[in-house]
Amino acid sequence: MEDLDTKIKTLKNMGVSESDAKDSLERCGYDVESAAEFIFSGQLEKSRLVPIMSSTSIASSLPSYQDTFFLPSPRKRRRLPGRIGTVLKPSALFPAIAPFLFVVFEIPVALNTFVHATCKGLLFAEDNASFHRPFTDVSAHLSSSSLSKYNHHSNHRLASPGWWYGEDSCISQSLDPRSVMQVQTIRAFEFLFSSHRLYLDTVHITAALSQVLAGLGNTNTSMSDGDCIAAFLSSYFSPPNAEFDSTFCSTLSSLTNSEKPTYIFNFKPNSTPDLRLSIESCLDLLLHPPSSAQKNWSWIKHVGKVFCCSLPGNNASGTPRFLLTPKIDLSKCIIENRDEMLRRYQLETVYRKTLLEWEDLYKRLTGVTLTDKDIGELLTDGQQFLEKRNPALSSHLQLLKETLQTKISTLISNTNATQHKLSTLYRGMQNKCTRRLLAVIIEPSIIYICLKNSAVQSNRNVSPSANHNEQWYLVRFTTSATISQDSPPCIVEPVTFEEVDLEFEKHISYHNRLLIYVDDDCEASTRTVIPTSVKNFIAEDNEYFDDELAGIIHSPTVSTRSSRSSDVSEYDLEDQGGLQLTVPHINTDVQCHRSRNSACEFPESMHVEHSG
């Protein structure tokens, strides 16, 4: 029992829940290394997967995904503790993105809505029976309350067709419900793929579309992202009418196969509705899927290529309104860090096991119990004790110590190099441009975001950040295996920028840290279409982050602490704190320059190429 407890504790130290640790150990013959690989390779979660069509019987992992999800009124939506903001943003758009939600996250309410919308002919042609084949028994899936609420919205043209956050309507009320659904789905695609504010991955959405298409009879599993999306749109929509001839839907459908890999995410200028994105919605949809809240490492295998979206500096014919370019393969970075961390735990396990054996031998031979000795001192004592009695074992212990020192130092070096690269992001080039810091992701469950300060003006106890018009928030997602009313999906609390800076500097993590910026092209044509909300958002941060990314890694105006270097810290075996990582702290004095290709350069793997 004691040995099993030790193995479970080892896996829990790797970020695995106790239930997952027990399950994986049972499946792998109680071998820790095999159990860890079974978990982190995704085999454990895969073995628990339930077919999509039976997901209606699963209780939702997020209790807040209930009937209140359908309420269009912001004041009626579920709110975070302290009335800081809204966790979920229900709106009339929800039915349009329901297929993605129920396939990716297996949310029953999303499936219910999708089934009902399907049968009502809002998403499909009513005379096309093939669309209804996978969903025959609607009444078996719909609750009476959700059905009545959805009926109410559909009878009133899906309530307000405004965007996700409850802003004023951007779509003409004269449109019929089917056209509204078309436009809102187009906007949903644009949001999911083209957020100005976050680095997005496409794996979830592509996988969702593939599975939906499979449910409709398409068994081609080797389609590319572009082919998959095009096939999905072809199945779900009739050709757009003249009013939407230049929308994302028609632009995408008209592309040839050779064009899709390069231009799949391009949009024609002035063709799409005015987007009014909210940072909370981005976080809800993209950074906190329910699966990542339940299992600390399960999200790793879902992370795909990361894209960055920018606004081109000209509005010439043929220039896309948005330009998305691949930046890094985030899954590779994370998995490499994961493997290194696993290796570290394996080394420490062997290391500590050896020390425990010699501690026991030391006690039996000398009668002295080593209770207040740390690892380094115990090693020294063991070596001195063995030097004359067993030189071979003494040499072996010394070799073990040196091997661990070397491997840990290498890990520190690699981790610091990665974090330093991500903390500087851009290099100084020619021609000035401006950008501002929007969010800091230290690890998947710890995110800092910057919002307008209006949400906390009534709270006199909150110290504002350096900018009185902005407020930083810590969004900490739960890492527990279950989510309940007492353990919400995330906690949001206001913080100062100095706290963000300090946490970024001192937090020990084996994840790549991400600094997320919004940039604006100072030489952009006045005809370039940029939503007003985005313009205002960019202008506010530019005042405080206009000197970022020029290679400067310290700022006396932000902190009076001595600047940290990016050199590798030594692993001190006598240091109770264990592994220490040196991370350069964040700067608000930020300046970067524009390259001749109208893009801020990313170092090496972070490089972004833009068409001129």
Swiss-Prot record:
Pfam families: UBA (PF00627). It is found in: Cytoplasm; Nucleus. The keyword Cell inner membrane does not apply. The modification Phosphoserine is found at S595. Coiled coil: none annotated. It comes from the Eukaryota. Keywords: Cytoplasm, Nucleus, Phosphoprotein. CDD domains: UBA_atDRM2_like. One of its GO terms (molecular function) is ubiquitin binding. Residues 3-42 form the UBA domain. SMART domains: UBA. GO terms for cellular component: cytosol; nucleus. PANTHER family: UBA DOMAIN-CONTAINING PROTEIN RUP1. This is UBA domain-containing protein 6. It comes from Schizosaccharomyces pombe (strain 972 / ATCC 24843). The gene is ucp6.
